[in-house]
Amino acid sequence: MSGHSKWASIKHKKAANDSKKGKIWSKIAKEITIAVKEGGSPDPDQNARLRMVIVKAKGTNMPNDNIDRAIKRGAGAGEGANIEEMSYEGYAPGGVAIIVDVATDNKNRTAAEIRSIFSKNGGNLAENGAVSWQFKKKAVVMIPAAGNTEESLMDIVLDAGAEDIEQDEEVFTITGPMETLSSIVDALKAKGIEPESAEIVRVADNTMTIAENDAKKVMKIIGLFEDHDDVSAVATNLEITDNLIEE
């Protein structure tokens, strides 16, 4: 399994089982609110981005009431600060590239906190465009391994634009060009297969291997970013090994 697919699978399992569900659901609620505002409709049948975020929410067992509240907030019901999306680019120890995607109601506060995490952990915040050229946005869909086979899934998703399928013990990870996300999910649902997760993810064109000590420092920074309330996603070009995941 590739480093990216391995890491995506680990993060998916963590989201499904993490004891800190409240923080995960809070982040997804922001994504739902933004999806409604940007997609222009609270109806997932008319809003592809919202439809995909709801798939992600259900994959973490987010209660329907929480999902509905976030949709209403995005549609203008209730109070709530304006949430903005932005990205920060930088370097971690060993020259590893990192992109941090955030959804925040206070970009000055968030920028200062992101900069602090970089600087206090051997990294540095860079200007926009410094590392983003090393990544492409991809559709990544997770399917339960139980009851499915690689061959049967290939027959379903290749015509929908998927490029690759990889498997670990519990899930199949399907990847394809960013614009194929909805078509892959729709093709699976048409065959009665419910994805556990479906989202657009930044994937590095090439990964890099560095000294294990530096790699552990990079994993620490990634963990700090992922624990930040405003961070929605973290991408890196570090080659994620089994040893690092087990740490």
From Swiss-Prot:
Q: Which SUPFAM superfamilies match?
A: YebC-like
Q: Which UniProt keywords apply?
A: Cytoplasm, DNA-binding, Transcription, Transcription regulation
Q: Which Pfam families match?
A: TACO1_YebC_N, Transcrip_reg
Gene Ontology molecular function, alphabetical: DNA binding
An individual GO BP term: regulation of DNA-templated transcription
Q: Provide a GO CC annotation, any one.
A: cytosol
**Where mainly located?**
cytoplasm
Keyword Hydrolase set for record: no
Intracellular or extracellular location(s) = Cytoplasm
Signal sequence extent: none
Q: State the protein's name.
A: Probable transcriptional regulatory protein BHWA1_01533
Q: Which organism is it from?
A: Brachyspira hyodysenteriae (strain ATCC 49526 / WA1)
